């Protein structure tokens, strides 16, 4: 079992709860309440900002030029379609301008932002990888249901499409390989710290989804 497999197994509880969360299920069913979805997208925008900052730290902390390029290419993609989607979706959902320009973070959003910010500030490459992997692997699993038809609503369908597909699968596979590689030379204490960080990220991502219904 690889180290990334170990982390995924350790986070099995919050992982299962997040990938079958009410919000995810309702998106797949095409019946999520517009107000709740709009509120969630506002919170996603707050997280996206710190997520991009963390990607910048990962770019700076990379130990291999080819890895730095892979991170940089992905950061450019995240700054494009996902950010554009949030703006368009909030237009369609009539999210008030004040909520977009002066958003108030929910408690779980604030905690997730704090985690992203602290890992960014530390600029430790394996730690950056652990958080990025937990976040995006969880997104991929949430948006992957081989036997399910995607929703017909274009906003909901695009929300899923941004979290899956060959390019996104390749990104998650890259993060797994990088974390497996960079963690191989670490001692048990450092690997345990990465395991705890991965688990904490999964727990906060679950709490972040819960925030849509508070």
Feature locations, PLM:
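Active-site-proximal alpha-helical scaffolds that flank and shape metal-associated catalytic sites
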Residues: 42, 66-170, 199, 203
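Hydrophobic alpha-helical segments
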Residues: 2-3, 7, 115-118, 207-210
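Alpha-helical bundle segments that constitute or directly flank the non-heme di-iron/ferroxidase center
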Residues: 12-18, 31-61, 127-141, 209
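Acidic, low-complexity proline/glycine-rich segments
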Residues: 1-24, 165-177
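Acidic, carboxylate-rich catalytic segments that either coordinate divalent cations
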Residues: 193-214
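Short, charged/polar, low-complexity loop and linker segments
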Residues: 24-29, 116-118, 181-188
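Secondary-structure edge/capping motif, primarily at the C-terminal ends of alpha-helices
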Residues: 55-62, 119-120, 143-150, 182, ...
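Long amphipathic all-alpha helical oligomerization modules
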Residues: 168-198
